[in-house]
Design a protein with these regions (language model features):
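Conserved acidic residues
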Residues: 10, 69, 120
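Structured adenosyl-cofactor binding patch, chiefly the S-adenosyl-L-methionine
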Residues: 113-157
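Single conserved hydrophobic/aromatic residue that forms the stacking wall/gate
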Residues: 1-13
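A short, Lys/Arg-enriched amphipathic alpha-helix followed by its capping loop at the start of a domain
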Residues: 20-31
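Rossmann-fold NAD(P)-binding glycine/threonine-rich loop
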Residues: 106
Length: 158
């Protein structure tokens, strides 16, 4: 099973993004078991420092993980790949991961040290900074693209 875990709220995402994200999730499910879990955003964060906020979000992220999960952080400091390389990466993971493969998008300040320690890998979708809702959409689109590449679908063109 592939899982995308997100720190944040559905309330902060526009309907147009939700529609597009759900469309790619449904398309991707033709090829593999895929689920998206939203970890609730923290309340009353204005009084919290960035480090405290990362720690609290990190506790919620770690609580959502299961023993044996292979954890991949979507992080600006992670490895960058072209779409073809990501498809090959997914193929390797699907052939070797016995439990869940969990991709995590962090909160506005990134991840806590404990979440970095729990991670097996880091991937970057771009060196640019994107909004949380954009990253959700970009990731699910790239996951769908990877599945069509692996299955010979007409979606991807080189």
């Amino acid at each position: 099973e592939i899982r995308l875990s997100l720190v944040g709220s559905e309330m902060c995402i526009r309907d147009s993004f939700i529609t597009a994200i759900n469309d790619y999730i449904q398309r991707t499910r033709r090829y593999l078991s895929f689920d998206m879990e939203v970890i609730p955003e923290l309340k009353n964060t204005k009084s919290l420092s960035a480090d405290v906020q990362k720690e609290k979000e990190g506790e919620l992220i770690l609580k959502a993980l299961q023993p044996g999960d292979v954890v991949v952080l979507l992080d600006e400091g992670g490895k960058e790949m072209r779409s073809i390389e990501f498809a090959d990466y997914m193929k390797r993971k699907m052939n070797t991961v016995n439990k869940r493969l969990v991709f995590i998008i962090g909160g506005p300040y990134g991840f806590s040290p404990k979440v970095y320690e729990a991670a097996h890998e880091k991937l970057s979708l771009s060196r640019m900074t994107f909004s949380h809702q954009m990253i959700r959409l970009i990731f699910v689109e790239q996951l769908y693209r990877a599945m069509t590449i692996l299955n010979g679908g007409p979606y991807h063109h080189e």
